[in-house]
Amino acid sequence: MNESSHRITPMLEQYLSIKSNYPDTLLFYRMGDFYELFFEDAETAARELQIALTARNPRAENPVPMCGVPWHAADSYIHQLIQKGYKVALCEQTEDFRESKGLVQRKVTRVFTSATTTEETSLDPKTHTYLGAMYWDEEVNIGAFCWADVSTGLWTGIQVKKKSELWQWIQKILPKELLFPEKYELPATAKLIEIQFVPLPYKTHFEYPQAVKRLLQAQGVADLEALGLEKHTILVQACGALVAYLEQTQLQDVNHLMPFKPLDIGKYVILDEITEKNLELFKRVNGKKGVGTLIHVLDHTLTPMGGRLLEERLHHPWRDITTILENQSVLEWLILYKENMKKLQDALKAIYDLERLSTRIVLNRTSPKDLLALKNTLLILPRVKDALIVEINVKDNRYITIDESILSTMPTILRQLLTKWDNISDYAEKLDKALDENPPNSIVEGGLFKLGFNAELDELMDLLEHGESKLQALLEKEQKVNNLPRLKIGFNRVFGYYFELTKSAGTPPSHFVRRQTLANAERYTTEELKDLEERLLSATEKRNTLEYKLFQKLREELVSIRPRILFMASLIAQLDLWQSLADVAIRHNWNKPTLLTNNNIFIREGRHPVIESIIGKSVFVPNDLVMDETRRMLLITGPNMAGKSTVLRQTAIICLLAHMGSFVPATEAQIGICDRIFSRVGASDNLARGQSTFMVEMMETARILRQATSRSLVILDEIGRGTSTFDGLALAWAVAEDLVCKDHDGVRTLFATHYHELTALEEKLTGVHTMTIAIRHWNDELVFLYRLIPGPADRSYGIEVARLAGVPQSVIQRAKIILTQLEQTHQQPRSLLNLLPGVVQNANEELSKQDVKVVEHPVVTLLKEMNPETLTPLDALKSLVEWKLLYGTTHAT
């Protein structure tokens, strides 16, 4: 819309001037008790928020579109807009309109975006909300990606050497917003990722010298070595851009960010975004959260910090056996001391979100209720510790402090945690003495502090509460001292408080000063009345001013102890995660796995935790599984619906849980440490990217073949679909061969397939073992037993599965007839072993050693030797008969 066509008032001039600095935002412009929006912003906000669109000067030739929301309800409207991908700039009045001599001064105090919000109402308490920044240097072919949860201050990042790996991490973390240099060309598929991409100028955001300066200032350190970034130039540039963007949106220093630590990938089992999706760790395949996901089964956390730590641990399971065993030992201890765990759970339920509370305190966005929540949490801290160091005497229900000998039975990691415990009792007591139990919604409303916290504030509060009685007391005093029983006290807006004396009521004393003469009375004031009036009329404003001053002083003190608060938040999160995993183990009868340094996997009566939680333990059929150096690849055959995919997924999930330090859904499990877990399971077209099911499958398979090592675990389901039978079979064969022979030791692989020809690999390659899912026929019905047994399936049972799926009986009967005819009239394909010249240990090496020769059919050879010019019709006929016989003989072998 062209603003020049409208009559621009001084107020609108101010609006447009401010708006010009924030062109990509919706400007919430404070006017009294409302935030107003004008021009295109008003039209957009009215449409998105479903509020009335009006006009300023509606009778003008070109009225200015406008809409508004009440200031006290602005948070909910802003939340709606940022959830829809908009940015909102909040423009406040910076001076009191009563003191302003002209136009009230205003300025933007904050910019809201989807990744930078800190308001509790806009955040999922148990999920991180990340802001990301990426940078790729074409000259050195190195890229970096960093991500920060602005609401907690947690941030980290990585530096990589492949663009594909960079985008794998971006899709795994999935930040709400991703910052990138505006001249960088995003891949064509980027627009399909659920991320807001924010282009930024290179010079002002990513340039190295500025990035270093900005990063060091934000972190309060002298050099990059303090952050472990001295060798991560590209990562520094990404971090610098992230800090710059935060400064632009928060409009203040961003010193609330925790000390930066690059993510040490070597410490963790790597799960790419495809594996997380296929295993349904956080979302179901349809994209929905909740029931049907692994985190839904695991999440018995009782605090927001614990919930977010569970999310982190599921993203990044450990590789270090010592760390895993330490965490297992705590779960064992909690399961053994169930009463103590119950006390711990009761205490944790009262804990608020210390990380996000402390961030709002630092950013000066805290509310009185935030302070009350902090106080209540600090007062609970002793109970949390006592839950673990106090023994319950069941007989008489007494609590006894555990002596040193019993304390020594605690796992070392738990005992060390308790020795570092800080109740922050000094500030718990201070807040308890200071804060009223029923605080106002906003600090400007007053009533935050208790009586007795501050003498001056007490006096003001006493005035406000007892003002009428003080006026009455002064009246009674004057009546008595001056013998004026008919003296009255009153108030009006012009003269304020006054004494009123009728002409017949008596003579006014000398200290009475006349204020107003009426027909039958006089109104007076006194020094004492004026003093009381001044104190009464200014008490509310003075109280609010003093409370705000005391509030800010208290807030600054809390900022100084934020490291202590965050440290305790991390301990509480760890305790909460431990109790959650212990609780899951008790509820679902999970057992402690043994971690191995070799590549073996042994699972007895393993179960899929998500499916079991839905259908019930009594219904779910558990399975055993063994992988060792003679069984590096398990080729699993069987019909659809028999349970092949379930076995694959549950094996990967059991391995993942073991690396989290969790117990696992199995009677017994021995798990060799993994460096990566890969999952290529299920079919999915990506039509928006122009990728068929087959293309998606091959891309995922290619990633596995390039990145898997002998320490990895790979689960593959139905490689080679979506193309011709022989193409698919050849690809599946080659993939299996590559995985079995990789790095000489092979990759631990579970390979489910319908290509029964692949079972021949068991005879030729060491490490391949065939398995199938047991089925039975009962009264011409196919019964799935869901039990994994040795050997290949005898056939595919496709028609039987189709009947179970509800395909009409007429179609089923016709399919059976056609199948019988095909089996009778078509020669069976030769064994794949006979088709192939031999199984090669390394296809690439084999091809490099020899030329690939095409063996001609004998008929083709004879045809080439024939000379048509000398051939008689009779000879030609004889040749045709001979060739036909020869063709039939060769095709019968």
Curated annotation (Swiss-Prot):
Glycoprotein in keyword set: no
Query: Which domain of life does the UniProt lineage start with?
Result: Bacteria
Q: Name one molecular function that GO assigns to this entry.
A: damaged DNA binding
An annotated GO BP: mismatch repair
Is Magnesium a UniProt keyword of this protein?
no
TM ranges are none
Q: Which UniProt keywords apply?
A: ATP-binding, DNA damage, DNA repair, DNA-binding, Nucleotide-binding
One GO cellular component term, please give it. Answer: cytosol
Pfam families noted in UniProt: MutS_I, MutS_II, MutS_III, MutS_IV, MutS_V
Q: Where does ATP bind?
A: 638-645
**What family does the database annotate?**
Belongs to the DNA mismatch repair MutS family.
The cross-references to PANTHER family, in alphabetical order and at most eight, read: DNA MISMATCH REPAIR PROTEIN MSH1, MITOCHONDRIAL (PTHR11361:SF34), DNA MISMATCH REPAIR PROTEIN MUTS FAMILY MEMBER (PTHR11361)
Q: In UniProt terms, what function does this protein have? A: This protein is involved in the repair of mismatches in DNA. It is possible that it carries out the mismatch recognition step. This protein has a weak ATPase activity.
Write the protein's name.
DNA mismatch repair protein MutS
- Give the gene that encodes this protein: mutS
